[in-house]
Amino acid sequence: NGLGLMLLGVTGNEVLPADVYAQIKADALSKVRGTVQADILKEDQAQNTCIFSTEFALRLMGDVQEYFIEKNVRNFYSVSISGYHIAEAGANPISQLAFTLANGFTFVEYYLSRGMDINKFGPNLSFFFSNGVDPEYAVIGRVARKIWSKAMKMKYGADPRAQMLKYHIQTSGRSLHAQEIDFNDIRTTLQALYAIYDNCNSLHTNAYDEAITTPTEESVRRAMAIQLIINKELG
């Protein structure tokens, strides 16, 4: 208990009995939290930083998901199905959501074609949306959840846990102005409020100077302060 995986390297002398090591490793894999963003479809559609072909990347994504199922990795997301990059490339809120959900269902169909159980891989899927100041962003999360849960239940027969859509919000980089950058914190605060009132699972607030440079320590502290003040002082 309490021994991290990083301490369990192979040496000339056995540190722990093999069965104890195997149990610690299995427990760690079942509890560890994190996200693999590797969404190849948003790369093709928006970000364009593809290293591998779409077909090969999909196969790798499927391999990761199969490993997660085999090793009972239940709390780590195998993919972050990303609309943020699509929005940054110019999509409005409605188009962002449409492309992102379509990509999500593409992954579902592909994993099913490889013989995976939807109730085993459904909980490993997560989403990533942008929030701008357009009014549709006030409801993007709840609309996404309603569409996703209905399709997962009625089309694919998923259980309640696999029907749940978990999503991260990052405030819109595209909305930041290069002139009078100090006012960007106001834009980011409004976007953060949209996200919180729409019940996002996690939130990233952009630094006000990202329109012109790599964020500084001061601007990042201000971006973090937006979240902290909303969380601790609002309401």
Residue map of PLM features:
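K/E-rich alpha-helical interaction surfaces of small helical-bundle regulatory domains
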Residues: 142-154
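Conserved, mostly hydrophobic/aromatic
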Residues: 148, 198, 226
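Catalytic alpha/beta active-site cores
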Residues: 1-131, 136-137, 155-158, 162-168, ...
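Histidine kinase transmitter module recognition
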Residues: 195-196, 229
